[in-house]
Amino acid sequence: MVKQTTEMNDASYLFNTGAGFNSQDYLGCHLAASGRAVFRVWAPHAKAVGVVGDFNDWQPSALKLLGATGIWQGQVPNVHAGQLYKFQITTPTGQVQLKIDPFAQQFERKPGDAAVVVEPMTMRWHDSLWLARRKKSRAANRPINIYEVHLGSWRRHLDGSYYTYAELAAELIPYVKQRGYTHIELMPVMEHLLDASWGYQQLGYFAPTSRFGKRDSFLSFVDQCHQANIGVFVDWVPGHFIRNYDALYQYDGTPTFEYADPERANNRRWGAWNFDLGKTQVQSFLISSAEYWLDQCHLDGLRVDAVSNMLYCDYDEGREGQVNQYGDNRNLEGIAFLQKLNTTVLTHHPDILMIAEESSAYPQVTGSVANGGLGFNYKWNMGWMHDTLDFFMMDPLYRHDHFNLLTFAFVYMFDERFILPFSHDEVVHGKKSLMHKMSGDRYNQFANLRTMLTYMAAFPGKQLNFMGSEWGQFLEWRDWSALEWVDLKDDLNHRMQQFTTQLNAVYRHNRPLWEQDHDPAGIIYTHTDDPDSSTMGFIRQAKRKYSFVVAAFNFVPVERQDYRIGVPYRGRYELLLNTEAQAFGGTWTKLETTFTAVDKPYRGQPASFTVTLPAMGALLIRPVKVIGGVKHAR
């Protein structure tokens, strides 16, 4: 047990008691005056610890154990930024092994895994206006339209080499801004060795990957995103870590970061080791990592990966007997850790977002910790995603028999605060791209995709789409090569990209599509019970009485003449979007752009108007001047 021999705010005490939320400022390598550096590492069961690196010809400089803290410390001369180093650990059995610095802020390029000595962070930020606006606005009441990106395959040079952070800033940021997205979500940028892991088996929890450049170049990328009014989320993996023996596994020769029980430690599904989330030092390590990315790197939020794996003792492992003291399979340490993580982070940064990728039916993922919830701001709506894809993959001839795939989500849409995700996981490993999933010939695949993305934009919840879907890339995603940008030479792909740009603009500039995403008052059900026609309609309502958007969908390739739509008020309405417009790759050369609602009740609404509902298409319509209303009430 660690004894408190100094003040309560002593860094070693805080780290050991699970309250060290900036432990990277204490542990790791820290340059001091006169070319010296202080090295500290937690290795509680080691017999001896040294540091080796370029500064001592890789001959160990001994560190001393600080009492009962489990932390080893030493000051080493002739240390300069850019030099490589590792810790040399002598295990309880006398084995000598080289280990990474868990708190390193930069690593050498793979295949090496030595840490790099870095200068203290001196980044001059230029995003004060962005941060000020972020503090003033509530996420629930603003548009969130996320472009998910794998930096290693968004673009590559002709020789196959990666774009640097600087090159990505020069091309990715203007592209995302032009397309109209509000945020970028980066698949993990934390240092990792295996490209095929996509970053989800992490080596460095405080280090942007060196594949694309140095730490400060990554910070500049984030800064430039904010200057362009684009938020940045990053995927973060606090549940499991890379198997490599020279990383965190058996760090001091005993289970240090992972569970002591080998069954609980071994994550067979992903070939990784599970963190012991009940260990206070591990809590300090992981929460410090989250705080580092949010505070020091100015990220706008973290998408926490594989939350289900942390909620259950035996998640997707097929093992029996993994139970808690209450006899069920809830991972009580994992649940408590997530509550502590979100409470800590959101207390320090109330304007950022913590997003859960959680695929089970665990309750109250976005509920408050005080009421027993996990405390996340958002949860990915995996059920909506799977059901929606299953519906659009189906031959339209059979959709009327499976309309529940769409309507079931209406039952639980407000149980959590949801993000609707068409992510990287759905376009890889033989699952096909979004475009390739769509039913029908090439023309109808584009029509289906336009309709599905419009359905997503109109449905309550924030939204996320993976790169390449915006133009309907046919090939599924491959992490080892760039997107198929050549597709844009094809007229249909080019028009699909223009459609996505317009849809994003309609979404962003119309409050009803996002202002009340998590409030039942944000949707009026007008036509959700007609499976025989395979059509659907509903109204998205903003807080202002006369600010709403009418959404109508036709999920079969049969045009509906004189299709009646019920609305709350008589008066004049205008078209926002017709997915079958020729400009988007459809067949409509002349669009109905205005509609007049009369006092003819329909489907529970006092007024109505008729439209021609395009085959395999969707319409978004808003009021212009209604009785008692105002023009363009957005």
UniProtKB/Swiss-Prot annotation:
Metabolic or biological pathway, per its Swiss-Prot or TrEMBL entry: Glycan biosynthesis; glycogen biosynthesis
Gene3D superfamilies to which the protein is assigned, alphabetical: Glycosidases, Golgi alpha-mannosidase II, Immunoglobulins
One term of GO molecular function: 1,4-alpha-glucan branching enzyme activity
Domain of life assignment: Bacteria
Transmembrane spans: none
Protein name, entry field: 1,4-alpha-glucan branching enzyme GlgB
Disulfide bonds: none
InterPro entries attached to this UniProt entry: A-amylase/branching_C, Branching_enzy, GlgB, GlgB_N_E_set_prok, Glyco_hydro_13_cat_dom, Glyco_hydro_13_N, Glyco_hydro_b, Glycoside_hydrolase_SF
SMART domains: Aamy (SM00642)
EC number per UniProt: 2.4.1.18
Self-association state and partner proteins as the record states: Monomer.
GO-annotated biological processes: glycogen biosynthetic process
One Pfam match: Alpha-amylase_C
Sequence similarity: Belongs to the glycosyl hydrolase 13 family. GlgB subfamily.
UniProt GO cellular component terms: cytosol
Function recorded in the entry: Catalyzes the formation of the alpha-1,6-glucosidic linkages in glycogen by scission of a 1,4-alpha-linked oligosaccharide from growing alpha-1,4-glucan chains and the subsequent attachment of the oligosaccharide to the alpha-1,6 position.
Catalytic activity: Transfers a segment of a (1->4)-alpha-D-glucan chain to a primary hydroxy group in a similar glucan chain
